[in-house]
């Protein structure tokens, strides 16, 4: 029975290739859609494979620039670390992928969108909540979750439908990567006591193999946007890719994390985020120089909520819109240059300057050039401590009265 068109989030792997056949057999015309957010895959080969295994159309969308400008940048400016450790690699790309799938579905008049997420991960939530936030009436198909196939059953179905089955040894890991980093799980990593083996890493060098000489770089920010690396102006996605290689060489950005998944279980993940680690540290350093105290102390509260919204698949929500408006306001003064040393896994911000700097050497110095009015301190201290002083006096008087 004809069911119309379905847009499939297609990766080129066995899972989503099998999905093409399954959806086709169910009566759909399948449009395979691969969104490039910086994975480094052979996109032309993926496009051709989609057609070969039965899609009526196979589309590849280069979304690296949009990913950097519209998704990575707010996460950078909002210092988005889930559980104060994970800079949201996979979670950050999902809303953009959802947005592109919806755009393709509307353009082609599709009646459904399909993905290949398992029933115990976070991505099923991110995809489906995101899709319905943009198109509430859209039908969603998820054969991988709904069929509960074993690997053997999946391979058998692939053979029956003429889908090429990988003959090489399957990697024990489940890997997802983009501009902002690389996420790795499964295999030996499922035992949180076991150290991640060398083959679990790809973007970073082991500390014992890193150079014995540091690299010192300068990152320029314009309204919170990193615009230059060592004086060279670059589009954000290119700056990230260039910095990723440089920082990875020094073993920067390895994160071994047991995190709380949205679906209620704990999961051990190994992340590599060289560029993200450096940029987040440098951006925070520039904010420390340019943000007034109350703003500096309040912003982390918003940052925590931002990271939770991204992780939990609520990018397309009123609260996210409000948080992004807040972040935009905070970035107006985040202008200047941060000097950073990269060495043996460490990111050391060792210099910073800004036309919006709130640091006054004349007020901070302990030399004869000091302009701080120390005589004002006594009155300030008296008024600042007055509430606690009054409280103590009342408590003492009550104790005397009760004797």
UniProtKB/Swiss-Prot annotation:
HAMAP family: Arg_succ_synth_type1. ATP binds at residues 9-17, 116. InterPro entries: Arginosuc_syn_C, Arginosuc_syn_N, Arginosuc_synth, Arginosuc_synth_CS, Arginosuc_synth_type_1_subfam, AS_cat/multimer_dom_body, Rossmann-like_a/b/a_fold. This is Argininosuccinate synthase. GO terms for molecular function: argininosuccinate synthase activity; ATP binding. One of its GO terms (cellular component) is cytoplasm. Pathway: Amino-acid biosynthesis; L-arginine biosynthesis; L-arginine from L-ornithine and carbamoyl phosphate: step 2/3. Its EC number is 6.3.4.5. Keywords: Amino-acid biosynthesis, Arginine biosynthesis, ATP-binding, Cytoplasm, Ligase, Nucleotide-binding. The gene is argG. Belongs to the argininosuccinate synthase family. Type 1 subfamily. Homotetramer. It catalyses: L-citrulline + L-aspartate + ATP = 2-(N(omega)-L-arginino)succinate + AMP + diphosphate + H(+). GO terms for biological process: argininosuccinate metabolic process; L-arginine biosynthetic process; urea cycle.
């Amino acid at each position: 029975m004809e069911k119309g068109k379905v847009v499939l989030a297609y990766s080129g792997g066995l899972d989503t290739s099998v999905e093409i056949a399954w959806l086709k057999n169910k009566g759909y015309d399948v449009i395979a859609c691969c969104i490039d957010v910086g994975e480094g895959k052979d996109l032309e080969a993926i496009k051709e494979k989609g057609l070969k295994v039965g899609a009526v159309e196979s589309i590849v969308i280069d979304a690296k620039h949009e990913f950097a400008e519209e998704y990575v940048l707010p996460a950078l400016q909002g210092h988005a670390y889930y559980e104060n450790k994970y800079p949201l690699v996979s979670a950050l790309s999902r809303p953009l992928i959802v947005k592109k799938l919806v755009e393709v579905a509307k353009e082609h008049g599709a009646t459904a969108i399909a993905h290949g997420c398992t029933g115990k991960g976070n991505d099923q939530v991110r995809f489906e909540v995101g899709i319905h936030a943009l198109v509430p009436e859209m039908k969603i198909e998820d054969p991988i979750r709904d069929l509960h196939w074993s690997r053997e059953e999946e391979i058998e179905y692939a053979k029956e439908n003429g889908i090429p089955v990988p003959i090489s040894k399957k990697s024990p890991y489940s890997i997802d990567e983009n501009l902002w980093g690389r996420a790795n799980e499964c295999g030996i990593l499922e035992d949180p006591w076991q150290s991640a083996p060398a083959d679990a890493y790809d973007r970073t060098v082991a500390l014992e193999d890193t150079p014995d000489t540091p690299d010192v770089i300068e990152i320029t920010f314009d309204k919170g946007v990193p615009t230059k690396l060592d004086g060279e102006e670059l589009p954000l996605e290119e700056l990230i890719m260039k910095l990723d290689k440089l920082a990875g060489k020094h073993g920067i950005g390895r994160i071994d994390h047991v995190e709380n998944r949205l679906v209620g279980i704990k999961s051990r993940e190994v992340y590599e985020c060289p560029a993200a680690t450096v940029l987040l540290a440098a951006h925070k350093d520039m904010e420390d120089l340019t943000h007034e105290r109350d703003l500096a102390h309040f912003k982390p509260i918003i940052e925590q909520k931002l990271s939770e919204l991204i992780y939990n698949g609520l990018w397309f929500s009123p609260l996210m819109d409000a948080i992004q408006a807040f972040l935009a306001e905070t970035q107006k003064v985040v202008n200047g240059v941060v000097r950073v040393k990269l060495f043996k896994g460490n990111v050391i911000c060792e210099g910073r300057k800004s036309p919006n700097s709130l640091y006054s050497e004349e007020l901070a110095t302990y030399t004869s050039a000091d302009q701080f009015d120390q005589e004002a301190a006594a009155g300030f201290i008296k008024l600042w401590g007055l509430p606690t002083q009054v409280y103590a006096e009342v408590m003492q008087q009550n104790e005397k009265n009760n004797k």
